[in-house]
Amino acid sequence: YVDKDGKYQGYDVYFAEQLAKDLGVEPEYTSVDPAARVDVLTSNKVDLVLANFTVTDERKEKVDFAKPYMKVALGVVSPESAQITDVSQLDGKTLIIAKGTTAETFFEKNAPNVKLQKYDQYADAYNALLDGRGDAFSTDNTEVLAWAKSNKGFKVGITHLGDDDTIAPAVQKGNTELLNFVNDEIVKLGKD
C-alpha cells in the first residue's frame, strides 16, 4: 500500500527490495491498478507483479505465478464509531472496494444488497473511507489489518471472510528464468 507520505509499504515492498538486492539492481516501482495487474505483465510493461496478487484459475491462464508466500481471506475495516462486525450490517450500506479484486468478486456474488463503491487504486479507496464516502472498506485481511493499525479511529470488525486464498508473485507467461529465481528467493526467505 502507499502510506500518507506517498511511499510504498508492506510485505510486497520488503520482498521486492530483497529480490532487487539479490539481483544486484535497483527496483523500479510502477503503480498498478488492481484490475490491471495481468495486463501490465502481458503487455511487457513490468517484469514482475508483487501487488498482493491473489492466485486464481482465471489469472493462471494468462500469467505464471511463483510459489505462494501468504494466505489471506477478506477483511472489512470501518470507523470505530460505526463498526461493521457482520456482513449483514452492510445491507443497504456503501462498501468501498478496489476494482478487479477478490473483494469485488465476493461481494457481487454474495451480497446483492450492498452498494459497492469501486475505485481503481487502493489509495483512492482508503481515502474514500477516511473521507466518509462509504461505510466500510474490504480487501485482503492482511491489508486492512495493517492499515487500521496506522489509522486511528478505524477498526477491522470482520477479520476473516470468504475462502482462504494464496498470494503469490506473478511473471509473464513462459518467463521461467525469472519465475525460478523468484521461487528460489521465496524458499530462501522462508528459511530466514
Locate each region found by the language model:
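Short helix-initiation/N-cap motifs at beta->coil->alpha
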Residues: 13, 28-41, 82, 99-102, ...
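Flexible hinge/capping segments at coil-to-helix
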Residues: 69, 78-95
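Extracytoplasmic small-molecule ligand-binding "clamshell" domains
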Residues: 1-52
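Hydrophobic residues within well-ordered alpha-helices
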Residues: 19, 41-42, 90, 129-130, ...
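Ligand-binding cleft/hinge of the Venus flytrap
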Residues: 2-5, 16-25, 103-120, 148-149
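A ligand-binding cleft/hinge motif common to bilobed small-molecule-binding domains
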Residues: 39, 51-61, 108-109, 130-163
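Periplasmic-binding protein-like
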Residues: 70-78, 103, 141, 145-192
